[in-house]
Amino acid sequence: MSEAHMRFADVAPASLPARRLAAGGLRRWLGRAAAALGVAALLAAPAAQAADGAELVLLGVAGGPTWYGNDAPHGISSALVVDGKAYLVDLGSGAYRQLRRAGIKPGAEQAVFLTHLHTDHIIDLASLLMYDPSARRRAKASLQIYGPGRRGALPPLAPGLAGDPVIHAENPGAGTVDLVDSVVAGMAADLNIRVRSEGVPDVRGFFQAHDIVVPAGVVKDPNVDPAPPMEPFEVWRDERVTVSAILVPHGLVYPNFAYRFDTASGSVVFSGDTALSPNLVKLARGADILVHEAIDPAWVDHIVGPKPWDARQQALARQLLEAHTTPQQAGEAATRAGVRKLVLSHLVPGDAPAEHWLHARETFKGPVVLGQDLMRIPLKQP
């Protein structure tokens, strides 16, 4: 099979029934689906949770703060499992449920890395923090949460928009520590009742939030250039993984990070939400796997509405197209970075036909994986 062919899965989604796998039904079904799209498929049985080594687990692959339908993927979230310990990147809608469906148990999570604080990347953080406190106590859990700090001054209103809307004026650009503190404060009535009447553990003892500090002197004005050229910088290191970050452009969102995870088994980079970015290319140089976002331009035309566009429509289209990457641009980033494999995730819309993402093959000649919920991909090359 040509390396340029789209691979639906290096391994199958772990949630499918074992009896179907044993009967070969999954292989036949996906093979027919691939053939119908003119795409060669590489199929393998689902892997159990890795006891050692490292694997990428796609918990959810849909992007955007919306619901695409019952059959659409869950919200964006990924896990890197290294020697049985999990490192999470973003927690979109349904991420907590997917985490457990993937076989990752309470207490296995070591750290969370939030790329940015858009709702579709953080909405299930509260579930992770609040659920299963007794299991976390038994596991002696200690979860570290890393993400963007406070933004600072808000950006100016986009051209053509009216008014001066400011939400939560006392702290309109809240950071990760603020977010976690607010979750705890908002749940205080529930938490206090459970602690005082049921003996449930105080969840505050199981996690700690950290604002990632951008190196001094890199950003002069985030409202002018929120992701200027810079070098990657380390944000986490333990005996299993080293995590580096870099700023990437996503409209005027700031700070907005991409992350690289280096392990003894290989390396994986998560683009987060980004336009085509030299910083991302620098971070991903030589990585085994690049997990990159993608947006379908045809969907943008549909969602914005018929032309001519008014000021609001123009602002929406600009945000969608200039703050994200097309499949071709994701492939270009993978080629420029010299990565071994490209995985498309944070798919916008989550329910687009698979063939819409195939354009990544035009600009990247290595293996391209169309991300699916609960897909497991080993870092080591087979």
Question: What annotation goes with each model-predicted range?
Answer:
Residues 1-28:
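N-terminal secretory signal peptides that target proteins for export/translocation
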Residues 3, 7, 11, 50-258, ...:
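Binuclear metal-dependent hydrolase catalytic cores
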Residues 28-36:
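Sec-dependent signal peptide recognition
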Residues 35-43:
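Hydrophobic helical h-region of N-terminal Sec-dependent signal peptides
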Residues 45-47:
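N-terminal signal peptide c-region/cleavage motif recognized by signal peptidases
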Residues 89, 271-272:
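Short His-Asn-centered micro-motif
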Residues 255-258, 264-269, 275-375:
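Cap/insert and terminal regions of metallo-dependent hydrolase folds
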